[in-house]
């Protein structure tokens, strides 16, 4: 089954689908339709490509029309979960869709309910299509088939013409049997080619075997035909080949399951997988029937055809024919001579006796010549048979020798391939080592870059230190200047400033001491670390030196081992060359002996011998060329191997040198870096010492500053004392005026002192500013110190990075040492492999010695067989001589000979059938071995696909069933409602109508009665009036006026009463008429309502009918799908039963919902179980595949052993068969000999009696002599016919010997020995299992016998449509089914 579903837009034809139960077209109409089907089918296979093109054409958001009549926008394009293949999701303009963008719980896009629909992209169009375009015009391309295609089909389907040199047979035989030349030499060629191709069949490239339409092929090894179809099919997955067979052994006429793939006669079409079909053009695939047909044609060849064939048998037959032709004119000449002698000597009886004697002598001479010719022919045939047997044995030996040599060459090739693999591995190792060396170089370069950066950093640090030194010198000068100023001016003030300065100086001193101690500790740790690193580097360098020395030693040992191995390889190759040369020499000697034996033969066999010589020379030249090519290949491979080994050694040396150089460079760089780092550390130490000296100088300055501060303190104390004195003086100023002058003087002094204080304050401010500047400078120095600390930290970090890099280098060196160790192990492995190869060479040499011993044994067997053949030839010559003696007096023995010929033909047919069976068995065995893996893969794929398809189809069917059930329920409810409404309305209208009618009828009856009564009353009154008038006129005189007035009053009263009654009746009539009008209007309204209800009912009936039709179409579709799912339903019977139960229980909605939830849960559980089962199955498949691979390997080994045993057994059985056949022939000939001896005795007695009668009746007339002559001529003709029969028998025996030799050469000698039942039972193969590629199942039937591709019954079923022929049946162009129009189609391809 194909993965992708075909697109819905098929070319709409009027042919029904295969599953539908509709009319079939008649034979007259079906013929052109069948002719057009191949052209339609030709465009069928690339449906998936067209579908992909449709998907590529459309874009999301594009406006399209579904089926040409439903407008909308594309919202989704791609694959879905509800069905395989490409789908398009469309949002329709109107709510005519089926969903809201989600199907089966998976959302693909969002839209309003009933506006979303999913369909195939092939059903979308960008324009609105009219109904005729959507329905009719699409059929044009599919229906119109060109006459060229039909003509081509008829030309291709015609059988190939037979060759001119073969006699024409009836039409069926020409179609059945492939053309084959009747030459026996060609048969021997094909036999030899088949032998060579038995060994080389597997080596034919796939490119040469690619099938094409029109190729001549074999299906299953026995059924010949022509390829008519190649590609994928709908009934099974994979590539299939449709073949039109030569014989009616097929299953169909090119169509399977309603889809036509090609056109042919019924029972001539057959579908098979591509791997089961083989071309006939290859020598290995010549059918056994072709060989048998060729043999039959050779046996039935006329002398005219024998003249055309230059084979040995034809030459012998030519000689026999020539002898018979040359003997006839001699007979006629002798007859003319005898007739002339009789004409001269008619006069007496003595003349008759002399003529009879002369005739007898002439007959004896003819018989002697015939015996000589027969003996020559027998010798030639026996010699040819011996030569053919020798050739067959020589070919067998040669083929075995070639196979052995090929096996050995294959072993050598495998060894060379192993050596090449080792080379590749060594090259990979070299490349890895190169990469590692490059990585090391890259890291060394990185280290050099980091060292350069460190050098730059050290230079910058040196410059900073120089600047700091300059700053320190300047500050020292400033301190000296401050000291001088302080010494020069020591005022009593500024005590507070000096205290703050002293505190700051003490803090700075503490910081400097801490920094100094930290710096000293770091320097000591760094020195210790550098010492340890240097020691570790020295150790690593020593280890690297030792590793490099070891690698060099190992390389030298490997070189020596490689040289030794190359020498051993060259020695082994020389030994092989010598052995091959000896084998070639022995083969040439054998061929020369065969040539000598051929040269001893008859001159007529020279053509065949020349062909054999040319074949042998060709084989020898091919063998020599192959040996030379193999030797050249070995030399080239050996030289290339040596060159590669040399290049590998050179590369190893280069890599080692590069490693040593890189190590030395790394060492030098490390030494230089260490030296530079030591110099830098010494510089930093010197600078630190200088800084310490400067710090000491600052301490001295601080001590001086303290002394100055103490002096200032003394001054301040003196000032305080002076102030106290001034206070005392002020107090004394009041008491003593004399002290004013002193006060003034003191004031002056005070003013001077104040001035000095002011000066001191100004100096103090200056000194404070200087102190601030000094503090700033100290802060800057602190910053510089922090920078130095940062630089030291950076240096420490660089040191740490260097340490890490040193560690990485150590690890790399360790890894290189490990790689060296691994290289050593690899080299040891290579050495071990070389030892293994040496052992293999020793084994091969021992096998060669065994083969030589086998050759000597075979030569001894050949000699024994030659002796046996000589004995058989001698026995055959004796038998032929006996037969010749018997045939001198032979009589009516033609019937027995024909029986013998018939028996021989039957035996030959049985032999041919056995050969066909053997070829079938061999092909089936090889095919089974090849197809085990394919079967497993197909089984997995088919199971997965079946599971997927089953789930998808199950979901689709469930959804469709739910939809159908909903529609059915709604339609049924609507129908019931409408029916109820209609029945109620009809019943109500009927009752009302009847009641109204009854009332009206009653009213009419009453009114009519009243009218009648009134009319009668009026009539009576009128009559009374007239009577009264007449009475009044008559009785005027007699009656009085009062009576008249009373009568008149009574009459007037009655008249008024009648008038009132009339008015009442008129009013009642008017009322009744009004009521009638209203009733009529109501009636009309009810009639209109009834008409409307009828129309509604008709519309609803039409809808119901359409629903029914849709339901029928859906039922048909469901039936088709059920037919398609029949195979799956066999596997899923339980699920089908559960679904059937659910279908029966679908009547109630509540039960449906409950069961739906239950089923969903069960489905989830089933899916889980299926996933678990799949996992288990995958595990089991993996284990089975492993076991299959193991069994296949064992089978291949056993097959190889069996083939060897078969080759030996075929030779022995061929000999047994020849011996048995000759024994049976000898027995039959002995029985014929006994019968012929009896007949000869009877003939001798008859001759004696004839002689007596001649002696007694010597004086008879010439009429008796003529009768005797006629009798003798008839006997001579009979003997000639017997000779011809014997020649034919000899030819048949020759053909039989050739067939036996061919069977022995083809390896089919097992079937010839059909009498050895015990041997057959022992060595019979197990019958292969049947397997169908379509159904993917074992043991049921073969692919060729699959019922799915069987042709349907030729008798079409009777039509079930019983409508009128004038009416047009509704036909849907979308579904291609009858029952509804395209406008009313509910497309199943949408979701």
From Swiss-Prot:
Q: What about PTM? A: Phosphorylated. Phosphorylation induces conformational changes by increasing the affinity of the N-terminus for C-terminus, resulting in inhibition of its function thus decreasing its binding to microtubules and DCTN1. Exhibits a folded, autoinhibited conformation when phosphorylated and an open conformation when dephosphorylated with increased binding affinity to microtubules and DCTN1. Phosphorylation regulates its recruitment to tyrosinated microtubules and the recruitment of vesicular cargo to microtubules in neurons.
What's the protein's topology in the membrane? Peripheral membrane protein
Coiled coil location:
349-1306
Q: Where are the zinc fingers (CCHC-type)?
A: 1370-1387
Which of the residues bear the PTM Phosphoserine? 48, 146, 194, 196, 199, 203, 309, 311, 314, 347, 1189, 1317
Q: Which UniProt keywords apply?
A: Cell projection, Coiled coil, Cytoplasm, Cytoplasmic vesicle, Cytoskeleton, Membrane, Metal-binding, Microtubule, Phosphoprotein, Repeat, Transport, Zinc, Zinc-finger
Gene3D superfamilies linked: CAP Gly-rich-like domain, Vasodilator-stimulated phosphoprotein
Q: Which GO CC annotations does the UniProt entry carry?
A: cytoplasmic vesicle membrane; microtubule; microtubule cytoskeleton; microtubule plus-end; nuclear envelope; ruffle
- Please provide, alphabetically and separated by semicolons, the GO molecular function terms listed in this UniProt record: microtubule binding; microtubule plus-end binding; tubulin binding; zinc ion binding
Q: Where is this region: Important for tubulin binding?
A: 97-101
Fetch the SMART domains from UniProt.
Answer: CAP_GLY (SM01052)
Task: Mention one GO biological process in which this protein takes part, according to its record.
Answer: protein transport into plasma membrane raft
Please give the tissue specificity annotation from the record for this chain.
Expressed in the testes (at protein level).
Q: Where is this region: Disordered?
A: 1-53, 129-182, 302-336, 1251-1272
Give residue numbers for the modification (Phosphothreonine).
Answer: 50, 181
Keyword Coiled coil in record? yes
- The CAP-Gly domain covers 78-120, 231-273
Q: Where is the composition biased (Low complexity)?
A: 302-331
Polar residues composition bias: which ranges? 146-182
Q: Which InterPro entries match?
A: CAP-Gly_dom_sf (IPR036859), CAP-Gly_domain (IPR000938), CLIP1_ZNF (IPR032108)
**What domain notes does the record hold?**
Intramolecular interaction between the zinc finger domain and the CAP-Gly domains may inhibit interaction with tubulin.
Quaternary structure note = Interacts with MTOR; phosphorylates and regulates CLIP1. Interacts (via CAP-Gly domains) with tubulin. Interacts with SLAIN2. Interacts with TUBA1B, MAPRE1 and MAPRE3. Interacts (via zinc finger) with DCTN1. Binds preferentially to tyrosinated microtubules, and only marginally to detyrosinated microtubules.
Q: What does this protein do?
A: Binds to the plus end of microtubules and regulates the dynamics of the microtubule cytoskeleton. Promotes microtubule growth and microtubule bundling. Links cytoplasmic vesicles to microtubules and thereby plays an important role in intracellular vesicle trafficking. Plays a role macropinocytosis and endosome trafficking.
| Protein's name according to its UniProt entry | CAP-Gly domain-containing linker protein 1
Q: Which organism is it from?
A: Mus musculus
Taxonomic lineage is: Eukaryota, Metazoa, Chordata, Craniata, Vertebrata
């Amino acid at each position: 089954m194909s993965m992708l579903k075909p697109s819905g837009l098929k070319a709409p034809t009027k042919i029904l689908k295969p599953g539908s139960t509709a009319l079939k077209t008649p034979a007259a109409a079906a013929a052109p339709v069948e002719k057009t089907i191949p052209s339609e089918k030709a465009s069928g296979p690339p449906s998936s490509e067209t579908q992909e093109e449709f998907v590529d054409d459309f874009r999301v958001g594009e406006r399209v029309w579904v089926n040409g009549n439903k407008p909308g926008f594309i919202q989704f394009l791609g694959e879905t979960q509800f069905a395989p293949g490409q789908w398009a999701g469309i949002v329709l303009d109107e709510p005519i869709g089926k969903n809201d963008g989600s199907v089966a719980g998976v959302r693909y896009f969002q839209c309003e309910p009933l506006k979303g629909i999913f369909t195939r992209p092939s059903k979308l169009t960008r324009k609105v299509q009219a109904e005729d375009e959507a329905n009719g015009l699409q059929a044009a391309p599919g229906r119109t088939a060109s006459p060229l295609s039909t003509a081509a089909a008829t030309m291709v389907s015609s059988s190939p013409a037979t060759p001119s040199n073969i006699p024409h047979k009836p039409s069926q035989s020409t179609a059945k049997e492939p053309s084959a030349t009747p030459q026996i030499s060609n048969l021997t060629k094909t036999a030899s080619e088949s032998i060579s191709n038995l060994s080389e069949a597997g080596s034919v490239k796939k490119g040469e075997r690619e099938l094409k339409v029109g190729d001549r092929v074999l299906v299953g090894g026995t059924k010949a035909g022509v390829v008519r179809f190649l590609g994928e099919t709908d009934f099974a997955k994979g590539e299939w080949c449709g073949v039109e067979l030569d014989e009616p052994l097929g299953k169909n006429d090119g169509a399977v399951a309603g889809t036509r793939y090609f056109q042919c006669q019924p029972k001539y079409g057959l579908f098979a997988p591509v791997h089961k079909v083989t071309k006939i053009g290859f020598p290995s695939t010549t059918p056994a029937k072709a060989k048998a047909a060729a043999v039959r044609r050779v046996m039935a060849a006329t002398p005219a055809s024998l003249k055309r064939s230059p084979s040995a048998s034809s030459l012998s037959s030519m000689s026999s024919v020539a002898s018979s032709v040359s003997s006839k004119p001699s007979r006629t000449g002798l007859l003319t001579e005898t007739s002339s002698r009789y004409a001269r000597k008619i006069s007496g009886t003595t003349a008759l006796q002399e003529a009879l004697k002369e005739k007898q002598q002439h007959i004896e001479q003819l018989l002697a010549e015939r015996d000589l010719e027969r003996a020559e022919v027998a010798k030639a045939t026996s010699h040819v048979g011996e030569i053919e047997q020798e050739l067959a044995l020589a070919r067998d030996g040669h083929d075995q020798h070639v196979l052995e040599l090929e096996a050995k060459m294959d072993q050598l090739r495998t060894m060379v391939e192993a050596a090449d693999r080792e080379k590749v591995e060594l090259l990979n190792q070299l490349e890895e080592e190169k990469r590692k060396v490059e990585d090391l170089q890259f890291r060394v370069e990185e280290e050099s870059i980091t060292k350069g950066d460190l050098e730059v950093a050290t230079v910058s640090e040196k410059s900073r230190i120089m600047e700091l030194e300059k700053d320190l010198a300047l500050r020292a000068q400033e301190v000296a200047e401050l000291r001088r100023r302080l010494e020069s001016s020591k005022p009593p003030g500024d005590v507070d400033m000096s205290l703050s300065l002293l505190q700051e100086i003490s803090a700075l001193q503490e910081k400097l001491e801490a920094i100094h101690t930290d710096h000293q500790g770091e320097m000591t740790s760094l020195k210790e670390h550098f010492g340890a690193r240097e020691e570790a580097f020295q150790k690593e360098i020593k280890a690297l030196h030792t590793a490099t020395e070891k690698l060099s030693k190992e390389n030298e040992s490997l070189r020596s081992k490689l040289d030794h191995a190359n020498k051993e390889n060259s020695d082994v190759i020389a030994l092989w060359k010598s052995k091959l040369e000896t084998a070639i020499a022995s083969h040439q000697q054998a061929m020369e002996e065969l040539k000598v034996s051929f040269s001893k033969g008859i001159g007529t066999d020279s053509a065949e011998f020349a062909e054999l010589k040319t074949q042998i020379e060709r084989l020898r030249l091919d063998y020599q060329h192959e040996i030379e090519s193999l030797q050249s290949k070995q030399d080239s491979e050996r030289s290339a191997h040596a060159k590669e080994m040399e290049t590998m050694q050179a590369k190893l040396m280069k890599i080692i040198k590069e490693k040593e150089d890189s190590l030395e460079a790394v060492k030098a760089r490390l030494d230089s870096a260490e030296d530079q780092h030591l110099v830098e550390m010494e510089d930093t130490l010197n600078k630190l010492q200088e800084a310490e000296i400067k710090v000491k100088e600052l301490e001295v300055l601080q001590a001086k500053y303290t002394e100055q501060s103490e002096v200032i303190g003394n001054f301040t104390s003196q000032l305080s004392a002076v102030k106290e004195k001034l206070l005392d003086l002020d107090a004394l100023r009041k008491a003593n005026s004399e002290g004013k002058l002193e006060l003034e003087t003191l004031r002056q002094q005070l003013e001077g002192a104040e001035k000095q204080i002011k000066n001191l304050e100004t100096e103090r401010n200056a000194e404070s500013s200087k102190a601030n500047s000094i503090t700033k400078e100290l802060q800057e120095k602190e910053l510089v110190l922090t920078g130095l600390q940062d630089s030291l930290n950076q240096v420490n970090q660089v040191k740490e990075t260097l340490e890490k890099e040193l560690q990485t280098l150590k690890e790399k060196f360790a890894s290189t040492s490990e790689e060296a160790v691994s290289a050593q192990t690899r080299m040891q492995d290579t050495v071990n492999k070389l030892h293994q190869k040496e052992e293999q060479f020793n084994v091969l040499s021992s096998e060669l010695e065994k083969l030589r011993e086998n050759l000597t044994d075979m030569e001894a067997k050949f000699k024994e067989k030659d002796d046996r053949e000589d004995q058989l030839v001698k026995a055959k010559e004796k038998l032929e001589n006996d037969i010749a003696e018997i045939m001198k007096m032979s009589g009516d023995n033609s019937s027995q000979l024909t029986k013998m010929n018939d028996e021989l033909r039957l035996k030959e047919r049985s032999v041919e059938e056995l050969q066909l069976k053997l070829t079938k068995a061999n092909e089936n065995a090889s095919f089974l071995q090849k197809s085990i893996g394919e079967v497993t893969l197909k089984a997995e794929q088919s199971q997965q696909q079946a599971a997927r398809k089953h789930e998808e189809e199950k979901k689709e069917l469930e959804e469709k069933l739910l939809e159908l059930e909903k529609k059915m329920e709604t339609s049924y409810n609507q129908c019931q409602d409408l029916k109820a409404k209609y029945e109620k309305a009809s019943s109500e209208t009927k009752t009302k109508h009847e009641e109204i009618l009854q009332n009206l009828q009653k009213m009419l009856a009453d009114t009519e009665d009243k009218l009648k009564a009134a009319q009668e009353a009026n009539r009576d009154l009128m009559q009374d009036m007239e009577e009264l008038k007449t009475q009044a006129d008559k009785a005027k005189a007699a009656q009085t006026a009062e009576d008249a007035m009373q009568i008149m009053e009574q009459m007037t009263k009655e008249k008024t009463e009648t008038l009132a009654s009339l008015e009442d009746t008129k009013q009642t009539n008017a009322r009744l008429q009004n009521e009638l009008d209203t009733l009529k209007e109501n009636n009309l309204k009810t009639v209109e309502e009834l008409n409307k209800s009828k129309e509604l009912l008709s519309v609803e009936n039409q809808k119901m009918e359409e629903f029914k039709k849709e339901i029928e179409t859906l039922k048909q579709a469901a039936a088709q799908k059920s037919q398609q799912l029949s195979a799956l339903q066999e596997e899923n019977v339980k699920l089908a039963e559960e679904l059937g139960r659910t279908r029966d229980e679908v009547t109630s909605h509540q039960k449906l919902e409950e069961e739906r939830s239950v089923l969903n849960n069960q489905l989830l559980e089933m899916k889980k179980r299926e996933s678990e089962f799949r996992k288990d199955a995958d595990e089991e498949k993996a284990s089975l595949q492993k076991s299959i691979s193991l069994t296949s390997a064992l089978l291949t080994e056993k097959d190889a052993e069996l083939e060897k045993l078969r080759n030996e057994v075929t030779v022995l059985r061929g000999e047994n068969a020849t011996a048995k056949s000759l024994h049976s022939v000898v027995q039959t000939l002995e029985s014929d000999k006994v019968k012929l001896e009896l007949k000869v005795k009877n003939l001798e007695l008859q001759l004696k009696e004839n002689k007596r009668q001649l002696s007694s009746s010597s004086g008879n007339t010439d009429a008796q002599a003529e009768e005797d002559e006629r009798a003798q001529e008839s006997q001579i003709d009979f003997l000639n016919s017997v000779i011809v029969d014997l020649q034919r028998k000899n030819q048949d025996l020759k053909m039989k010997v050739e067939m036996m030799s061919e069977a022995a050469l083809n390896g089919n000698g097992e079937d010839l020995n059909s009498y050895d039942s015990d041997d057959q039972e022992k060595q019979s193969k197990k019958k292969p299992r049947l397997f169908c590629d379509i159904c993917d199942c074992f043991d049921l039937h073969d692919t060729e016998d699959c019922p799915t591709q069987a042709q349907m019954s030729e008798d079409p079923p009777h039509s079930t449509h019983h409508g009128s022929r004038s009416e047009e049946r509704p036909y849907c162009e979308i579904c291609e089914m009858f029952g509804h129009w395209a406008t009313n189609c509910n497309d199943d391809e949408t979701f």
